[in-house]
Amino acid sequence: MNYMKRRLLLFAGILLLVALAGCSTTDPITSESEGIWNHFFVYPMSWLITTVANLLNGSYGLSIIIVTILIRLALLPLTLKQQKSMRAMQVIRPEMEAIQKKYKEKGSKDPKVQQEMQKELLGLYQKHGVNPMAGCLPLFIQLPILMAFYFAIMRTEEIRYHTFLWFDLGQPDYILPFVAGITTYFQFKMTMSHQQQMQKTNPSDSDNPMANMMQMQMKVMLYVMPVMIIIAGLSLPSALSLYWVIGNIFMIIQTYFIVVKAPPLEVEQTKQKSSKPNKA
């Protein structure tokens, strides 16, 4: 369920962005803007948007599309590392559960027993070269970058005076937010469907209260997130809706190839078992 937890955390961050958009400063960002966040995060993103737009004859719409894709591609190695770490944790999960079951029978509330269990789990992680925290670090690196780009779009003054396709980038649109909401739904649905499929291969999940609670939260978010995106998009500059649409499409493709098309866990677990040296 680790993947679901991280997805929920990421979408919680997006919800925070939506909320902050309504109450944060909308002063134009410039090289003279004060503060570490403005100077080292938001302004460089704004500069990149403007530079790419200038190369495209002033098309800020195309610039937002291209920069969104470039940022997502730049973050792809982190995403792959995160997915690899989570995948490794899922592969060794049967061994982890066996250790936890063994110490539960011994009396898991005993501090000494807990210490022994943690020591054995740590040995298991080291044996397979797995770091349980490795999947979290990429997420905390991605969020500031995505937030900076988000606010750069909000505060780059030149964007406000340009159009793209049928909409004015500086004004709310009444079509694009629904496209953003629909793509958000499909992105989340794809992740949720994969997790439900994974749960079928792990019967212990059906009896796990935490896993069931996460499933319920995912079901709620499946409908809450698209609605939040649509409501926000109807009141925010359409440049942000464009960013959400392109980002969602990229994430749908990424999730399909990295998560959905990944080999079944059973295959990797079988490989792992066959690679173990036979005891004489």
Curated annotation (Swiss-Prot):
Disulfide bonds: none
Keywords per UniProt: Cell membrane, Chaperone, Lipoprotein, Membrane, Palmitate, Protein transport, Signal, Transmembrane, Transmembrane helix, Transport
Lipidation (S-diacylglycerol cysteine): C23
Membrane topology term: Multi-pass membrane protein
Cross-referenced CDD domains: 5TM_YidC_Oxa1_Alb3 (cd19751)
Function: Required for the insertion and/or proper folding and/or complex formation of integral membrane proteins into the membrane. Involved in integration of membrane proteins that insert both dependently and independently of the Sec translocase complex, as well as at least some lipoproteins.
Similarity comment: Belongs to the OXA1/ALB3/YidC family. Type 2 subfamily.
One of the protein's GO biological processes: protein insertion into membrane
Covalent lipid sites (N-palmitoyl cysteine): C23
Residues of the signal peptide: 1-22
Location in the cell: Cell membrane
MF-aspect GO terms: membrane insertase activity
One cellular component (GO) term of this entry: plasma membrane
Organism: Halalkalibacterium halodurans (strain ATCC BAA-125 / DSM 18197 / FERM 7344 / JCM 9153 / C-125)
Transmembrane segments: 60-80, 133-153, 163-183, 227-247, 248-268
Classification via InterPro entries: YidC/ALB3/OXA1/COX18, YidC/Oxa/ALB_C, YidC/YidC1/YidC2_Firmicutes
Superkingdom of the organism of origin: Bacteria
Name this protein carries in UniProt: Membrane protein insertase YidC 2
Pfam families the record matches: 60KD_IMP
